[in-house]
Amino acid sequence: MKHCLLVAGFLAFSTLTSFAQRNPEDKAGWKLGSQSYSFRLFTFAEAIRKIDSCGLKYVEAFPGQTIGGGIEGKMDYKMDAATRQAVKKLVADKGLTLVAFGVVNAPNEADWKALFEFAKDMGIKNINTEPKVEQMPYIGRLADEYKINVALHNHPKPSHYWHPDSVLAVIGTSKYVGSCADIGHWVRSGLDPVDCLKKLQGHILGMHFKDVKKDTPDGKYHDVIWGTGDCKVDAVIAELKRQKFKGPISVEYEYHWENNGPEIAESVKYFRSAYSKSK
C-alpha cells in the first residue's frame, strides 16, 4: 500500500511538473510573457485576455493603463490596497502571473520606496525603469532591502541608457540592479543586439523582446513578426542560452495596434521553435 501511494505521489508530482513546464523555454527559467503596452489601446483587463490568447502566461504591466474589468482607476504604484487586491484577482483568475512593472520612474526616495512596496505587495520581481543617475545610490539600497530587481531599460538614443556602457556605469555592485535589455531599441540605435548582450553578461535581469525592420516609406523601424526583421532573434536566443539567463522576457509589439494579437501569437510560435532548435 505504501509503495502504491509513493508511486501515485510521484506520478502526480511528475504531471504537475510537466504541466508547469509545458513550454520549451520554461525549463531554462525564461518567463515569456507580454508587456501590456502591446495592447495599450485596450484596458488592462482586455490586455491580459489578449495575452492569454497568444499562449503566454506572464504579464508586465505599464503605468497609466486603464484597469477595466469592473475596476476603477489606472495601473499605478500609488493605487490603494483594495484596487491592488482586485487587480491581483483579475490576473490570477486568468491563470496569469504579474512579473514586471514599467517603464516607470519615481521623483524621489520616498516615492521609490512606495514603488518597491507596491511591487512587493503585487508579487512583482522586476521594476523596469530609466531613473536619473543621481538616484541610483538609494535605488540600489532599496533593491537590496526589498530583494526586487531594478532593470534599467534602454530607449533609443539620445535617451541616457541607450548604450550598454551607460547601464554598466551606474549599476554598482547590487545583484538586484542590472539591465532590462530591449533588443529592438538597440537596433534602432545602430547597435548589434548580440554584442550588447555579451557586454551586459551577468547583469541582464529581464528583456523587452521584439523584432524590427525598416521597410516603410518614412524610413523608420517598426515591429515585425519575429524572425523576419533585423534583431537577429535566433542568435539572441542562442546568446541568452549561452549566458544561462533566467528571468522575464516581455513581448513588446508596437505596431498594428488595433489587432496585433495574431502577429504576437505567430512571434511566440517562432520563438519557441527557435528555442527548441538552438543549442
Predicted feature descriptions by range:
Residues 20-36, 40-58, 121, 165-168, ...:
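Histidine-acidic metal/acid-base catalytic patches
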Residues 61-86:
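Glycine-rich, proline-tolerant flexible connector loops at the mouths of alpha/beta enzymes
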Residues 74, 124, 257:
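Second-shell loop/turn segments in exported
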Residues 26, 84-85, 90-178, 187-190, ...:
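Active-site acidic/histidine proton-transfer and metal-coordination neighborhood
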Residues 60-61, 100, 128-129, 152, ...:
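Hydrophobic residues in well-ordered beta-strands that form the structural core
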Residues 1-24:
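Bacterial Sec-dependent N-terminal signal peptides
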Residues 38, 63-65, 104-107, 133-135, ...:
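Active-site-proximal loop/turn and secondary-structure-junction residues that shape catalytic pockets
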